[in-house]
């Protein structure tokens, strides 16, 4: 089942990349908003509790695209780096010993959580900045 999930996500990612080439949005090639983040978050196997938290991360990431494109791009790149590291892990997992597997899986999971916290915070700061203008009236 896990291999089917990885295969589906790989095919889905390729389809998104190919279809987004026709878009004029400069972020469209890798940033299908919530779809992009959901794809990134689902790549690493996660507990049910973390799966629920990823929906908030996804919404915050979509909001951040509208609030601050520079931060959005920065966090998109961080998601990409985590994704690349995970695919390295998957390609080489048979060569790793038990401790290496556990360490790499743990670091990837922690980094993914950290990027989600950063995205949530940046979205909050962006909303606060917009509301501060209104509050200062």
UniProtKB/Swiss-Prot annotation:
It is a lipid-anchor. A lipid is attached at residue 22 (N-palmitoyl cysteine). Residues 1-21 form the signal peptide. Keywords: Lipoprotein, Membrane, Palmitate, Plasmid, Signal. Its main location: membrane. The keyword Membrane applies. It is found in: Membrane. Transmembrane segments: none annotated. The keyword Nucleotidyltransferase does not apply. A lipid is attached at residue 22 (S-diacylglycerol cysteine). One of its GO terms (cellular component) is membrane. This is Uncharacterized protein YuaE. It comes from Escherichia coli (strain K12).
